[in-house]
Regions:
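Short, Lys/Arg-enriched N-terminal segments with co-localized hydrophobic residues
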Residues: 1-15
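Hydrophobic, small-residue-rich transmembrane alpha-helices and their short perimembrane loops
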Residues: 16-156
């Protein structure tokens, strides 16, 4: 009897430790996304004219995101209210956390992508298509890492 109880206690502790893996891996993924972003930012961003156009694209994208998030906030508030009324508090909290993580991933992805665009154009101009593909791949991977990592954090 004692051996079985000890084994069950050990297994229970083991399961609790396994439950920590998804959020822990999510945090590691966010760190990896930040490192990849820093690597992308090390690529040259071109001459003054290219920088100016890139800055305008970046500003326009962020203005678009700001407007989009205003409209989404209204929808999310409505969805949270309906979730609370019909499905309960836990579901409403899950909707809030999911919407926040999705919004954060979208913002980080848009920010990184618009910064990578000008570097991709500069790499294509100076070093050719292979270099441009490399820069654009890393720029896009920031978004992918954020989506996957925030999803893992949300499982915690």
């Amino acid at each position: 009897y004692f051996d079985r109880m000890l084994l069950l206690n050990l297994l229970g502790s083991y399961r609790m430790n396994i439950a920590l893996f998804p959020p822990l891996l999510g945090v590691l993924g966010m760190i990896a996304a930040f490192v990849v972003y820093l690597l992308v930012m090390r690529y040259p961003d071109g001459e003054d004219k290219v920088k100016k156009i890139g800055d305008q694209i970046h500003a326009g994208a962020l203005a678009f995101m700001k407007t989009e998030y205003k409209y989404l906030t209204v929808f999310i508030i409505l969805l949270v209210f309906l979730s609370q009324v019909f499905l309960g508090t836990e579901t409403a909290i899950a909707v809030v956390v999911g919407a926040a993580c999705s919004s954060l991933a979208g913002f980080i992805g848009m920010y990184a992508a618009t910064k990578a665009n000008v570097r991709t154009a500069t790499a294509a101009q100076k070093d050719g298509g292979a270099a441009a593909l490399s820069v654009s791949f890393y720029g896009g991977s920031v978004m992918g890492l954020c989506v996957a990592s925030l999803g893992l954090i949300g499982l915690g």
